[in-house]
Amino acid sequence: MKHSITGTIGDHPLLLESGYLARQANGSVYLQCEGTAILATVCSSAQRQEGLDYVPLTVDFNEKYYAVGKMPGGFIKREGRPKDREILISRLIDRPMRPLFEKEFGRDIHVVPTCISSDMVHPHDVLAIVASSAAVTLSDIPFHGPVAAVRVAYLNGSYVINPTFSQIDAASMEVVVAGTRQGITMVEGGAREVSEDLMLGALEQAQEHIKALCDMQERLRGLCGKEKQTVIPSSAQLVGRDRIYELAYPRLAQALYAQGKGERRSACDAVKRDVAQQYAAQLENDVQRRLFDALFHEMEYEILRLNILDRGLRIDGRAIDAIRPIACEVGVLPRPHGSAVFTRGETQSLAVVTLGAMSDGQVYDDIEGDRRENFILHYNFPPFSVGEIGRMGVGRREIGHGCLAHRSLSAVIPDPEQFPYTVRVVSEILESNGSSSMATVCSGTLSLLHAGVPIKKPVAGIAMGLITDGVRYAILSDILGEEDHLGDMDFKVAGTCDGITGFQMDVKVEAVSASLMKEALQQARVGRLHILSVMNQTISAPSVHISRYAPHIESFKIAVEKIGALIGPGGKTVKSLSDQYRVTINTDSDGTVTVSGRDAQSVFDAKVAVVGLTEDPRVGRVYQGVVKRIVEFGAFVEIFPGKEGLCHVSKLSRSRVSKVSDVLQEGQRICVKLIDIDRMGRLNLSYIDALEGKSGGLDTTK
């Protein structure tokens, strides 16, 4: 039986429906907003696993090309492996929901939201969060939800709830806010140097709409929700738990405060190993081993948190608002176009910049249509960065961290008109002990400045943490990996000296209040300004010149009606020019022409040729041409592809010329001056006037 609930999301009508589609799933919801629709399902495995200390949750968002009536591109007409955008939306759904599942449920949970219709006006990521939460809420899977999300944009001096794609492009800030009735559980967004107060205003705007969307889900649950499965606490108990606790706790409390990540881990492992040897026979049982590991995790959690709340003592000895020592260096690699190393404590990022032509940009085949990105940032996290062995390659984490750093730096990247290059930044994480994505923002800024990219302002990032027992709390600046793992919040903020450009927050408690977030933002600003001051001591402005190994690029405009003349039949003209000058020539529909190549003179010569080809010949100007044919009365010279003129024998020299071939040869490149255009449009050229420099115009030989 079909059950429906209607409401609004921002100014747009919203439909939630269940009981008709995907009925064999534990829970399924069809959500529609205008012409965009999401089908979200959730299933759990039948078999329960004992002793898990995490939630085995997988979210696989996917978007179908049929949603917009589009055929998939490429040879295979079927959706393939998840695109980066699908992975990012999957993470966006996972993060606010994961803390609300019961760890002791012990079953694999699979959430599959699918975009099955899109009007290409309304973004479907926040709709997928609502649909996924609704599916879990009315399922039989235990869940401390519902969760809802809205996007808030700041546009023309006011906040807009769930803006359209065009409104997002014009906004100075856009942020996705997810939460429950109790408060906010996730924040992610980007901005163009906005203040902390403006961001907090967006969070306040979001909360009322989140509550309304949670109410819609509860109403649907009241109509067709299933009875929740009972969470049965694990019957397995660690044998000798109290004795193990007594043996390990005091030694672990000392080991956790060894200086240095490696030293701490070694000291803690030694304690664990010594205690395990005393219970070796018992720990051969897999369940007992998992319970033993869980107890040590519980003790580390307790020690770290109590020392921070009771004594303000962090494991590396810092004050709660202190930043680790910072070291910056640029120009660390000889050949790349720009490079820098940023080290903060035991976190280190090597960022390398490559400059390319505009045609080198990344093309994305989204369901809304193709788009080109001319600022690219790739984040790599090899296992050696944490002293481990493991699989090399790009996972969801790398894509997510790279997206955050990309968003944080995008606000300061120059427009193509100012800097007509594709810019690629690669961050290699060489060491990691917390906040590697924010280290990427810092190293990325340094490498861009070293490469000569005229960014608007330097950007720095910092990760904030939270420890709370429900009454007391401590906000930590520049958190370590252990503080992230054992803490209650990871709040990353990036920006310039004048405002925020990127942010991301995840919490492990049910919600975080707006007042606490305000305090965290203010503390983050102080830390960010400190980091920027250190970075500015190394490099504070773009290098005057780009690398001699970078391609040379000229960008200019031609008349739109001349684009066809430049391209030529079947691309013949532009290909001929590219081959002749050994450059790459690209043309946009608005008449923007970009010429790129390794040699500056070749790029300049090609530009001159394009300008000459696409403008009407002017009497009095000097052109560089090629002798095409020699006849008795002179030579025909091609001044640009398809345009020839006659250089009469009398215009070859001041003295008498008996044979034209005594002066010129076919294929010879010469400069000629256009001295006349007759009534039939024929061009009359002069070699001697060009040699004597009587041009009054452009000398293309320079």
Curated annotation (Swiss-Prot):
InterPro entries: ExoRNase_PH_dom1, ExoRNase_PH_dom2, ExoRNase_PH_dom2_sf, KH_dom, KH_dom_type_1, KH_dom_type_1_sf, NA-bd_OB-fold, PNPase
Location of this chain's protein in the cell: Cytoplasm
Keywords of this entry: Cytoplasm, Magnesium, Metal-binding, Nucleotidyltransferase, RNA-binding, Transferase
GO CC annotations on file: cytosol
Cofactor field: Mg(2+)
GO biological processes: mRNA catabolic process; RNA processing
EC annotation from Swiss-Prot or TrEMBL: 2.7.7.8
Domain S1 motif: 620-688
PANTHER family reported for this sequence: POLYRIBONUCLEOTIDE NUCLEOTIDYLTRANSFERASE (PTHR11252), POLYRIBONUCLEOTIDE NUCLEOTIDYLTRANSFERASE 1, MITOCHONDRIAL (PTHR11252:SF0)
Protein name as it appears in the record: Polyribonucleotide nucleotidyltransferase
Organism for this UniProt entry: Treponema pallidum (strain Nichols)
Gene field: pnp
